[in-house]
UniProtKB/Swiss-Prot annotation:
Compartments reported by the entry: Plastid, Chloroplast thylakoid membrane
Keywords linked to the UniProt accession: ATP synthesis, ATP-binding, CF(1), Chloroplast, Hydrogen ion transport, Ion transport, Membrane, Nucleotide-binding, Plastid, Thylakoid, Translocase, Transport
Gene name for this UniProt entry: atpA
Annotated HAMAP family: ATP_synth_alpha_bact
Keyword rRNA-binding: no
Lineage: Eukaryota, Viridiplantae, Streptophyta, Embryophyta, Tracheophyta
Catalytic activity: ATP + H2O + 4 H(+)(in) = ADP + phosphate + 5 H(+)(out)
Stated name of the protein: ATP synthase subunit alpha, chloroplastic
CDD domains, A to Z: ATP-synt_F1_alpha_C, ATP-synt_F1_alpha_N, F1-ATPase_alpha_CD
Similarity field: Belongs to the ATPase alpha/beta chains family.
GO molecular function, one term: ATP binding
Length: 507
């Protein structure tokens, strides 16, 4: 039989008393009054702050958005099917943040930065707040480096610089996503990290974009943040901020980043849904009063920081969908006023076979030629002028029966210039190829060809330049200038190729 010694027992009790640590935990709790439609009304939570995360009994997380006198309105970050009336809720004392790391490159994640591509967990040791303040005036510098999209129409006439916000706007099915994905493809080898945020889209459309990027090796430097049409409104509203937090992580590590929000109309609709369910007063088009702030605080995070913050940048290409070309609706006008210019895609041009369907007349870049290399400035000025004159003449020519020779020549030149702006999807051009194409058109070398021959000739000329006149590409990439030597090489190549092309066509 085991003997119990009194001194041992007293020692154990003494040790326990010494180790005892009296800890008082004050937890701010509340009770669910009502739940439904992704919204919960909570009684209690007296100390909760606006934007604070709250945790429900069964594990769902929500954000406290409405702080009222007798209850708190919480939006749920999940379906909330297991939340019951009367269950308890506790405030976490935190605001929404996500883990960030290099390991996110090449992955598809949701608005909470959790992987949804079935390739396992993502390891990260750091985290960033989803909503963080944009750089102030002093911590920015003006945009001066070009961000090449690979599309002639944009890089020559509506140039985008690193740190700029350029809106892509147009009706549905006009190629807005195609312009954005082509820009991602063109960043290959440019040391630019791309973030593509899909908001409220069909899962099949997102899968299509991911496959296109994977096939061309672009996923290596891209992160896809996706919240599809069946996601809760809260997550669709948060997705762009998650993308911005990831892009900022790289920007403050002196990397250049490009972020695409596809599209902000859907985010505004998700926010409208949340606001109406929270019984916030509706304004124009039933959007809440702070819908401008929703987009401005997101887009202001794109910047070219001053050299004291490193040499990184964050360029934003937000996409907005219009209804039958109406750019004067609420969300389009808001985003136009926030961004540094817009690329307007026209359904009429798209249906007429002009793709990318960019309406050069009303598209604008407020950064302008500061975001172009000298070589592009040298050749692009003439293109802009001639296309503007052509658009005016074309409208006039519809009513005039007999036109003089000079007008006919100008119309013929304009048609050929419009032809050289056409590009296949996922076929971006290098700067040297763009300069060659524009120079050939604006200097009248295409005037002798039929309109149907223009694209074929340009394809062959590009191939010929690549193989036989490699110095041309070298001069442009090393000096960034369209030198006399480069011009002489180009003229020679055009003449040689034109002779060969015309002989082929005669056969």
């Amino acid at each position: 039989m085991v003997t119990i010694r009194a001194d041992e027992i007293s020692n154990i009790i003494r040790e326990r008393i010494e180790q005892y640590n009296r800890e008082v935990k004050i937890v701010n709790t509340g009770t669910v009054l009502q739940v439904g439609d992704g919204i919960a009304r909570i009684y209690g939570l007296d100390e909760v702050m606006a934007g604070e995360l709250v945790e429900f009994e069964e594990g769902t997380i929500g954000i406290a958005l409405n702080l009222e006198s007798n209850n708190v309105g919480v939006v749920l970050m999940g379906d909330g099917l297991m939340i019951q009336e009367g269950s308890s809720v506790k405030a976490t004392g935190k605001i929404a943040q996500i883990p960030v790391s290099e390991a996110y490159l090449g992955r598809v994640i949701n608005a909470l930065a959790k992987p949804i591509d079935g390739r396992g967990a993502i390891s990260s040791s750091e985290s960033r707040l989803i909503e963080s303040p944009a750089p102030g005036i002093i911590s920015r510098r003006s945009v001066y480096e070009p961000l090449q999209t690979g599309l002639i129409a944009i890089d020559s006439m509506i140039p985008i610089g690193r740190g700029q916000r350029e809106l892509i706007i147009g009706d549905r099915q006009t190629g807005k996503t195609a312009v954005a994905t082509d820009t991602i493809l063109n960043q290959q080898g440019q040391n630019v990290i791309c973030v593509y945020v899909a908001i409220g889209q069909k899962a099949s459309s997102v899968a299509q974009v991911v496959n296109a990027l994977q096939e061309r090796g672009a996923m290596e430097y891209t992160i896809v943040v996706a919240e599809t049409a069946d996601s809760p409104a809260t997550l669709q509203y948060l997705a762009p901020y998650t993308g911005a937090a990831l892009a900022e992580y790289f920007m403050y590590r002196e990397r250049h980043t490009l972020i695409i929000y596809d599209d902000l109309s859907k985010q505004a609709q998700a926010y409208r849904q949340m606001s109406l369910l929270l019984r916030r007063p509706p304004g124009r088009e039933a959007y809440p009063g702070d819908v401008f702030y929703l987009h401005s605080r997101l887009l202001e995070r794109a910047a070219k920081p001053s050299s004291s913050l490193g040499e990184g940048s964050m360029t934003a290409l937000p996409i907005v969908e219009t209804q039958s070309g109406d750019v004067s609706a609420y969300i389009p006008t808001n985003v136009i006023s926030i961004t540094d210019g817009q690329i307007f895609l026209s359904a009429d041009l798209f249906n007429a076979g002009i793709r990318p369907a960019i309406n050069v007349g009303i598209s604008v870049s407020r950064v302008g030629s500061a975001a172009q290399i000298k070589a592009m400035k040298q050749v692009a000025g003439k293109l802009k002028l001639e296309l503007a004159q052509f658009a005016e003449l074309e409208a006039f020519a519809q009513f005039a029966s007999d036109l003089d020779k000079a007008t006919q020549n100008q119309l013929a030149r304009g048609q050929r210039l419009r032809e050289l702006l056409k590009q296949s999807q996922a076929a971006p051009f290098t700067v040297a190829e763009q300069i060659m194409t524009i120079y050939t058109g604006t200097n009248g070398y295409l005037d002798s060809l039929e309109i149907g021959q223009v694209r074929k000739f340009l394809v062959e000329l590009r191939t010929y330049l690549k193989t036989s006149k490699t110095q041309f590409q070298e001069i442009i990439s090393s000096t960034k200038t369209f030198t006399e030597e480069a011009e002489a090489l180009l003229k020679e190549a055009i003449q040689e190729q034109m002779e060969r092309f015309l002989l082929q066509e005669q056969v």
